[in-house]
Amino acid sequence: MSVTAAQVKELRELSGAGMMDCKAALAETNGDMDAAVDWLRKKGIAKADKKAGRTAAEGLIGVVSKDSHAVLVEINSETDFVARNDGFQDIVRNVATAALDTPGDVESVSVSLYPGSEKTVELTIKDAIGTIGENMTFRRSAKLSVENGVVATYIHNSVSDGLGKLGVLVAIETTGNKEAALAFGRQVAMHIAATNPLALTAQDVDAGAVEREKAIFSDQARQSGKPENIIEKMVEGRMRKFFEEVVLLSQAFVMNPDMTVEAALKDAEKSIGAPAKITGFIRFALGEGVEKEETDFAAEVAAAVKG
């Protein structure tokens, strides 16, 4: 029998399955909608590998901290609906927990045991793809530690404890009051969430990025027709402004724009009761760098039926 676009659309809405799966199910069951739903359900985990080709750009950032260590993980899903699912949220939280006992990179976390299970993180996520019905990607993971001090954390737009769309870790080295250091660290983490600095210090900025900016500023300055010595000063001024915008310690502190982050850190040493130093930070924003697929639903249905 021939399968209509209306049937494919209805089955997709009932099952949440993909277009081609819905078309195959209807063909196998002679258009019986209930039987087609059952046919898809029986596929179960077997659908997981097929889903692995679909773009997963939604999902959640998870953060877990313990003592002087903290981790960020990003697990993507195809839709925000699944990201709000309790089961998906548990997976993100547990993967972050597992990451604490590893070096923190995706490879080491993936082969570690999933909390409360004899399966690895990688296998648990693959099983969940079939159960939840969407492609899921363990995209990235990072760990930040400090020998003496604290690692402050911040989740922006939190949907649950330790879960949200943007996460930040900040390591502060100090022998002073940890609660005061954590409080200031959280403020810095919020600042980083808002400003997205490229590096901690000017020396840490990628050399290629610096040269690229310098070349752009030089070309712009030469268009003014001014002498070369004036152009050099113009470029120096613009590069100074560039570093003020992208270097964490040089940025105007969001909580008090009258001082830089470095000056705010010096001021915070009064409440911390000892010298303090920011030794590193990590910022994950959900889906950054992932190109989301924009699908014409009507065209997708038509293509599936014709295909």
UniProtKB/Swiss-Prot annotation:
Molecular function, one GO term: translation elongation factor activity
InterPro entries according to UniProt: EF-Ts_dimer_sf, Transl_elong_EFTs/EF1B, Transl_elong_EFTs/EF1B_dimer, Transl_elong_Ts_CS, UBA-like_sf
Keyword set includes Nuclease: no
Residue ranges of the region described as Involved in Mg(2+) ion dislocation from EF-Tu: 79-82
Keyword Coiled coil: no
Pfam families given in the database record: EF_TS (PF00889)
Main location: cytoplasm
Cellular component annotations (GO), alphabetically ordered: cytoplasm
Keyword line: Cytoplasm, Elongation factor, Protein biosynthesis
Signal sequence, start to end: none
Family per record: Belongs to the EF-Ts family.
Name used for this protein in its record: Elongation factor Ts
